[in-house]
A protein has these predicted regions:
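TPR alpha-solenoid repeat register
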Residues: 69, 104, 138, 168, ...
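Canonical tetratricopeptide repeat
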Residues: 72, 107, 145, 171, ...
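Short coil turns that delineate tetratricopeptide repeat
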Residues: 64, 98-99, 133, 196-197, ...
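Alpha-helical repeat scaffolds
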Residues: 53, 57, 83-96, 119-131, ...
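Terminal, low-structured helical/coil segments at or just beyond the last alpha-helical repeat
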Residues: 254-264, 509, 514, 521-560
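Structural motif corresponding to the intra-repeat A-B loop/turn of tetratricopeptide repeats
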Residues: 46, 80, 115, 151-153, ...
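N-terminal leader/linker segments that initiate helical-solenoid repeat arrays
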Residues: 19-73, 79, 87-88, 100, ...
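Residue-level recognition of tetratricopeptide repeat
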Residues: 41, 75, 110, 148, ...
């Protein structure tokens, strides 16, 4: 009903606009077209792009008569992955009145680039500058594309350097790769070994470059030194291809000598940047452009699946996931994991765990990375015995010097702790600290476990103080150190910490319970009962805790 009202108001406002008299409107427009157009806008604003597209298509009569129609229609087409259709619509319907948006000229520039008509591409790009409107990222896109066009036309890198930090450096690496510049290796190495950011993704493209130039042994030497457990999906897949002696797989999906391939990677970078800022709509827009330029690189669609998942659009997530099959082990496993997450949201955690465990057992000789994932799935589902079984497999397959050795011990040790096997738990956690003595979360977990058992309280407090010095904004560590002070009867200090933990994690039942206990000890009993009562309302409160809280609400702390 509300949507109908808005549609009526919008139509009324449009009819009364000084730009169009009622007579002019009746001559050139149809109220049905207007209704569909505004319905399209509403659907678009609600992120229902498929529905928006239907409405826009049914109101195409307005395409040359309403300034923003073409812009909304084009944006929706691209969001639906129909980039070529968007380009066609722009070509057929662009006028001086409806062409005042950056993306129209960008798409035309890219279409000309695809056809290697670089002069025409530059003309469209030049026009796009008129509509940047102080949007810094649009300016970066235009300037970077301008530099790529210079490389493609002149076969040399522009002497005019743009100062966009590592963004510019990444693109220069690809430009040098395209030119097969003698310093390409140096540039790739400088990029992937950067101390400031994680640019491990570009190892994949360096491997691609080496294989293209017949340097397979060097590529293999690089992947031999990569750890599956510590590598991204893309790097893991590349490592597997080399182990399986399938270097041709690299060439099938990307080539530095192909202009559209490297520009496609640039737009993936833009998309990834938007996604990291939770701007999923713009991320999807540029990701679809990236995929249009290089549809062979289907692995980039994993970001599109993640974006849809975060927006709770599970239907589109599942559709994208069908792009991945068993031939590419790691992306197939990504598909199964994401499906399991969707099942968890829609059908519950038990069905999700059944699904992932069943499909895991169908995989022959799963990678250690996949074993690690299935262990974590079971641990998170509180199936600790199953999790320990998988952690045992991992520990038997990795060297003690592996960067993740301490992490696996921590995960196995915490699983033992949840089962009440404190001997094995303490052994694993202490050994993990031998490997990484400054790992705050392990210090916190072991110390808190000891506090719960009222064991080595003084040492626990020292460990927690060390953990807090390393991560003083972590709510779990703040709660633990506060609870340690509670156990040694320093309630003032305890309250200072736990109060902050409650502020950081207001929905956590344990933190609220702890705060209630401390307030009771400080003789602030009405407040204590308030926080205990709050625990009963929280979604994550377990049954045993509810029973304990109900007793506290009746009797208070019986040892007070």
């Amino acid at each position: 009903m509300l949507i109908k009202f808005f549609k009526f108001v919008l139509i009324l406002l449009f009819y009364q606009s000084p730009l169009y008299s009622k007579t002019e409107t009746l001559n050139n427009f149809n109220s049905h077209h207007l209704s569909n157009y505004f319905s399209g806008i509403i659907a678009y604003e609600n992120n229902d792009n498929s529905q928006a597209l239907k409405f826009f298509r049914s109101s195409k009569h307005l395409i040359k008569k309403h300034d923003s129609y073409l812009e909304n229609y084009i944006y929706t087409l691209v969001l639906e992955g129909k980039v070529q259709q968007a380009v066609t619509e722009i070509k057929q319907n662009l006028t001086e009145d409806n062409s005042n948006f950056f993306e129209a000229h960008l798409l035309l520039a890219l279409e000309s680039l695809k056809r290697k008509n670089y002069k025409k591409s530059r003309e469209h790009l030049r026009r796009s500058y008129e509509f940047i409107n102080n949007d810094q990222l649009s300016l970066v896109i235009a300037e970077t594309l301008k530099q790529y066009l210079h490389v493609f036309e002149e076969n040399k890198i522009s002497k005019i350097k743009k100062k966009y930090g590592n963004f510019s450096f990444i693109n220069e690496v690809f430009q040098r790769c395209y030119l097969n510049d003698k310093n390409t290796k140096i540039y790739f190495n400088n990029l992937i070994n950067s101390q400031n950011e994680d640019y491990s993704r570009y190892i994949f493209f360096y491997l691609n470059y080496l294989i293209k130039n017949g340097e397979y042994d060097e590529a293999k030497n690089i992947t031999d030194n990569l750890d599956y457990l510590n590598s991204s999906l893309l790097i893991s897949q590349g490592k597997k291809w080399i182990e399986d002696q399938k270097p041709e797989k690299f060439k099938k999906i990307f080539s530095c000598s192909n202009p559209t391939d490297i520009v496609s990677e640039f737009f993936f970078l833009v998309s990834n940047l938007y996604s990291s800022q939770k701007n999923f709509e713009n991320s999807n827009f540029y990701l679809n452009i990236s995929h249009h330029l290089n549809p062979k690189f289907k692995f980039n669609l994993s970001l599109l699946a993640e974006n849809y998942y975060f927006n709770k659009d599970y239907i589109k997530t599942l559709k994208i996931l069908e792009s991945f099959n068993k031939k590419d082990e790691f992306y197939y496993w990504f598909k199964l994991k994401k499906k399991a997450q969707i099942i968890s949201k829609k059908q519950g955690k038990d069905k999700s765990l059944d699904f992932i465990n069943l499909n895991f057992k169908k995989i022959k000789n799963p990678s250690i990375k996949i074993v690690f994932d299935i262990a974590n799935f079971n641990k998170n589902a509180k199936k600790y015995k199953e999790a320990i079984k998988y952690y045992d497999q991992i520990i038997s397959r990795i060297d003690n010097s592996s960067p993740l050795y301490g992490e696996i011990l921590y995960r196995r040790g915490s699983s033992y702790e949840r089962l009440g096997d404190y001997v094995k738990s303490d052994k694993d956690l202490l050994k993990s600290l031998e490997v990484n003595p400054d790992e705050a979360y392990v210090l916190n977990y072991l110390a808190y476990s000891w506090l719960e058992r009222e064991y080595k309280i003084d040492l626990s407090l020292k460990m927690l103080e060390k953990a807090y010095a390393i991560r003083n904004n972590d709510p779990y560590i703040i709660d633990s150190i506060g609870w340690a002070y509670y156990l040694i009867d320093d309630y003032i200090k305890a309250e200072n910490f736990i109060k902050r933990a409650v502020e950081l994690m207001p929905e956590d039942p344990i933190v609220n319970d702890h705060y209630g206990d401390i307030l009771w000890k400080l003789n602030r009993k009405i407040q204590a009962r308030y926080f205990w009562g709050n625990v009963l309302k929280l979604e994550e409160t377990e049954d045993q805790m509810k029973k304990d809280i109900k007793n506290k609400l009746i009797e208070g702390l019986t040892n007070s």
